[in-house]
């Protein structure tokens, strides 16, 4: 058994310049916890594989393709491969999301 504590994982460099902590990586999947402080957002990007997002804390805006919704804690959002998406925190609180890419991408995410 392996247990990973998110507070012990260092935030890795990323093109969005936000707190992103890789919690799990295997040939089959990648899981990252992203924390957006008030006013922060991800750049719109395309992921080469399907992604699902689970909101851990707070609320924020998710954009996938032409759709835009406000989501909050304990909501799961599905995002198909190769569809532009991004997250935005327009609240005064922290917004944390678990990002799971399945399978692990063989190519890099592309910023738009």
Residue ranges and their predicted role:
Residues 1-28, 77-78, 111-112:
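A short, N-terminal "cap"/entry segment at the start of jelly-roll beta-barrel domains
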Residues 30, 59-61, 68, 84, ...:
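Structural motif
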Residues 32-47, 81:
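Conserved short histidine dyad/triad with adjacent acidic residue
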Residues 35-37, 47-62, 100:
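Short, conserved beta-strand element in jelly-roll/cupin
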Residues 42-44, 62-63, 79, 85-91:
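Short beta-strand His + acidic residue motifs that chelate non-heme Fe in jelly-roll/DSBH
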Residues 67-81:
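Short acidic-glycine-tyrosine-enriched beta hairpin
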Residues 81-106:
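Ligand-binding loop in jelly-roll beta-barrel domains
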